[in-house]
Amino acid sequence: MLFTIFKRYVSAYPVGLILVLVFTLAQVMGSLLLPALNARVIDDGIAQGNLPLVWQLGGVMLIVAVAQLATAIIEVAAGSYVSMAVARDIRRDFFAKVMTFGHQEAQTFGVSSLITRSTNDVRQVQQFLTMAMTMMVMAPVMAFGGLIMAFAQDLILSWVIVVTVVILAIVMALAVRGMVPSFQVMQQRIDAMGSVLSQQLAGTRVIRAFGKEDVEKKRFAQANRDMTRASLMVGRYFVALYPTVFALINVGTVAVVWFGARGVEAGTSQVGTVVAFIQYLMLIMMGVLMFAFMSMMVPRAEVAAGRLVAVMDTRVHLDRDSGRVDELPQPGTFEFRDVTFTYPGAEEPVVQDVSFSAEVGSTVAVIGATGSGKTTLAKLLVRLLEPTSGTVLLGGVPIQDISRQTLGTQFGYVAQNPYVFGATVAQNLRLGNPGASDEELWEVLRTAQAEDFVRELDGQLDFEINQGGKNLSGGQRQRIAIAMALARRAPVLVFDDSFSALDTATDLRLRQALSNVSATSLIITQRISSARTADIIVVLDHGRVVGQGTHDDLMATSPVYREIAESQATQEAL
């Protein structure tokens, strides 16, 4: 999957890649040249008393060091730009893909997992790219170049380096082999803890209402312990690895000094050669360490990249960009024509052979017991779901043939559990109509029966609503959501059980105000009081239409409708 990320995103920045590769190579070549120059300074300059040569070689070493600094700055800048640009592009495409998800795809991954993927996984890939672009060139050139230069300095001493490198490579291979599954487990534990925390934050009120704080504390503590154990599992490898690696480096250095000193004493080696050898040993070890570090990062980055690609390559069942129709011949009308819908994996359809229609300016109410398929019809109309069979028409056109841009202007939709954004009242209301004036906002608030409480808020239209409307009551949140839908000035309004948190008096005033709105309305409800004034009432029972007509007609002809009315036992319903 890392190759997929590289192919899609990194390859889009060839100039940055070339700069990183060229200047990293130049930096490593400078590192390989300095020990050889240092050896000449010691053996041919200081040992021979040749001060002009010392000054000459010292000047060359200074130039090389300055050049290394310059190349390192350019390399780091180019590498950082490429990695950050790639991370930006991944986040952009990830978000764009998630925005195309329907109900099925969103449930497949889960909200907490999608958040973790868009943050932690992108960060893992970015960190890997930052390191990899440098280390992929630096590690092999430094290791093999160091070996070649060491062999060129003293063939006899080179066996010390070879033995040390072989032992170090074996240690690293064993460590990486153990770390790969540990990183995978740790990523799973991160997801699990994020899921637990997300559920607890979202369900704080329910947890408190049921007095389950201690239970949830234990559940989070268990997830935290699992995460800690997974982290400690990885940490143990690092704890054992680093002392072992540095011990090997120190032993190799001591061996070079020991055998080098004996060579100097015997006249087969020179002091400068031994010093250069130690420096080359360090460079070789650095190269091996970089390679090992990369090997440890690859599994974690591979897991992260795979999780990102899994989201971005998901085939969306509902293609919202398939439509091409921009003009509707009968705007403000809709029709369900023999519509059946079955959720993936379900044995029975949730709605079956549903047919009804709405004319311009009319109000259609859909009523039925819990689980009868009412919300599914609302989602089918606004195309959050696609019918398994049958056709949903909007403005006389099959809804799948309407372009996404046009479809987005046709509805004011209030979901069953309305969501209010963390922004001011005005910003929420202008979400679907950015050009709406303050007077227009007060007008829709008045219609939604929200004007009185908004005027009492600190700042009124500028009052800051918490994310999800947590600082509003359920009824206030519903009325703000209704006002948001009205502010769109859309030809069709869809209210999915949107009056459930309102008292009977407010519900009545709201319905009276909505009757003056120039729009076709679909009202999903369980209340007879919310449905009785509709032009057409559609009665659903187990996903099928079992009655259709006005309130009086259904009271006379529909046993299901009459049973609902009688069970609510209100004077208005009867």
Task: Show the residue positions of the predicted features.
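Helix-loop-helix
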Residues: 49-53, 149-163, 233-307, 311-312
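ABC-type nucleotide-binding domain
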Residues: 327-574
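An intracellular "coupling" helix at the cytosolic face of ABC transporter transmembrane type-1 domains
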Residues: 7, 12-14, 100-104, 120-129, ...
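Membrane-integrated ABC transporters
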Residues: 1-34, 46-60, 75-79, 83, ...
